[in-house]
Amino acid sequence: MSWRKDQDERLDGDEGDEELDENDYKTQKDAVLFAIDVSKSMLKPPQNTGDKKADKDSALTAALTCAYQIMQQRIISQPKDMMGVLLFGTEKSKFRDDSGNGTGYPHCYLLSDLDIPGAEDVKKLKALIEDGDDEDEIMVPSKEPVIMSNMLFCANQVFTTNAANFGSRRLFIVTDNDDPHAGDKQAKSSAAVRAKDLYDLGVVIELFPISREDKKFDLSKFYDDIIYRNPAAEAGQSESPKTSKSGDGLTLLNSLISNINSKQTPKRSYFSNLPFELAPGLTISIKGYMPLNRQTPTRSCYVYEGEEQAQVVQSETAQVDFAARTVEKSELRKGYKFGGEHICFKPEELAELKQMGKKTLRIIGFKKRSKIPSWASVKKSIFIFPSEEQYVGSTRVFSALWQKLLKDDKVGIAWFVARENAHPVMVAIFPSGNPDDEEANTPYLPAGLWLYPLPFADDVRSVDHVTAPPRPADELTDQMRQVIQNLQLPKAMYDPRKYPNPSLQWHYKILQAKALDEETPDAMDDVTLPKYRQIDKRVGGYLAEWKEMLAKKANDLQNTRAFKREFEEDDERPAKRAKPSKKAASGGGGPANSNADLKKAFEQGTLGKMTVAELKDIMASKGISTAGRKAELVERLEQWVEENL
């Protein structure tokens, strides 16, 4: 019998039945095959312009480096996904190890078969890029023109045999040739047929074109007939491939990686075809997405190394009673503890208890956007977009609602049930502007509507009243305003794409170094660390002035409070005079009745001559603890005088 923490969590709360299964949403398997063109133009290095930021590697090297870096990321962060590299236009041909000379797919070289990337695959690709280890003369362009239908048919076979049941299969084509079959209509027609076969198979073709200064990539010549647009794709989103330019200030590698990363993770809906009721009799269908989700390191697992090949240990869970007898599932009942007793339910009763109506998103009213406080969020927001699959015209109605909410600066209040047995949630429907709209302040988020979960009355906790902090002087505020204005982020906005999680990246780098037998990095690259030199250069003088002003204000405030305490103590002194002690009558040092006397006694060192009773009376009047022996009382009183007088 083995035990897993997540098993106990499911047994305790059964939350998996009540919430959308986000783990399934995140871990759908994906298969990506890179198809990289090997031609003379792809092998040609860019001209040396003397610019340090200009490209130095050929387009082919940049494409292979991009595939290498993506493979490095996936080998750890997405261990269930498959990836492969196919070179086309090569002089040599190779399909698989057992397929002879690859005559079935001429000028196609399967460099890395579509599979879960292993350390050896990454090392092989790294040697080809960094060391220039091309002993097999793989990167030699063919003398004959490439036949694109052969490459597409080869990719078809790779996906069919290696990733037949994958939910997402994609072919990434990297090339600088916009018309591989110029003047050959038969070859173009054959390639279009093969592309249609891939589309029918469920494979999405993504093109990453490379243009040069003297030649712009023209999609209409060939690739418009190869790349199939998804008819059910979200309206309003451009699906045109982004062109990477070689030879300009922005390196080709960075451009390729940016374009590929934008399509690296396929769009997976969090829920699909959810009825969205805007009014009685007016319903459209929507899809939900989770654009923002906190990434955590992959879970560790137990590995058995007793055999030739290490194997992941398969865990099993069993329920036992007090006598260590295994309890069958039919003997178990689910229940809740109530009033010291366990209230048990049958499965059908429990299902009925969870039934809160059909899945829906129903608007119940509207409010000004300013009426929704920033703290009223209990979960992460869900991005919704229209779907035409169930209700034709959903896009137009959805767009009208979005534009109206933006125009009037309002939000919708809605009742949200994600699925049949899910808990209902009250949500605010927030509109987001276009990414290129500066007033929207969301250049990295899509335009549309967001479901912003709101708390119920049961979710609001009572908090003890906290007094507001004292208001600082206006001079301090004005001086600090200059500091803040000079330390603002670009465009006064936080862009999460520029700040990778340092702990997550460090975790992956260590695993990568172990897997690839590389040197362990000395320190992690943390871009969240403050740039102290730049901060000092910008606001060092302002901060020094502010600190001097703060010290002056604090000193003035301390003197004012000390004078006020002394004035109040003198006013509150009783009219009846206490009988002087013998020591006072004889001219000895009596107790200090005022702050001035107390300070004088401290300077003369006569506090220790007071009795314990006198010390306690003075300390009690000052709010100082009177516990301890005489030496402790004297020391505590001297410290108070030194700090306050």
Curated annotation (Swiss-Prot):
Domain SAP positions: 607-641
Ranges of residues in domain Ku: 276-486
Residue spans of biased composition, Acidic residues class: 11-22
Subcellular location: Nucleus; Chromosome, Telomere
GO molecular function: ATP binding; ATP hydrolysis activity; damaged DNA binding; DNA helicase activity; RNA binding; telomeric DNA binding
Disulfide cross-links: none
Cross-referenced Pfam families: Ku, Ku_C, Ku_N, SAP
Record EC number: 3.6.4.12
Top enzyme category: hydrolase
Principal location listed in the UniProt entry: nucleus
UniProt function note: Single-stranded DNA-dependent ATP-dependent helicase. Involved in non-homologous end joining (NHEJ) DNA double strand break repair. DNA-binding is sequence-independent but has a high affinity to nicks in double-stranded DNA and to the ends of duplex DNA. Binds to naturally occurring chromosomal ends, and therefore provides chromosomal end protection. Required also for telomere recombination to repair telomeric ends in the absence of telomerase. ku70, of the ku70/ku80 heterodimer, binds to the stem loop of tlc1, the RNA component of telomerase. Involved in telomere maintenance.
Recorded family membership: Belongs to the ku70 family.
Subunit and partners: Heterodimer of mus-51/ku70 and mus-52/ku80.
PANTHER family: KU AUTOANTIGEN DNA HELICASE, X-RAY REPAIR CROSS-COMPLEMENTING PROTEIN 6
Record-given protein name: ATP-dependent DNA helicase II subunit 1
Species annotation: Neurospora crassa (strain ATCC 24698 / 74-OR23-1A / CBS 708.71 / DSM 1257 / FGSC 987)
Lineage, top ranks: Eukaryota, Fungi, Dikarya, Ascomycota, Pezizomycotina
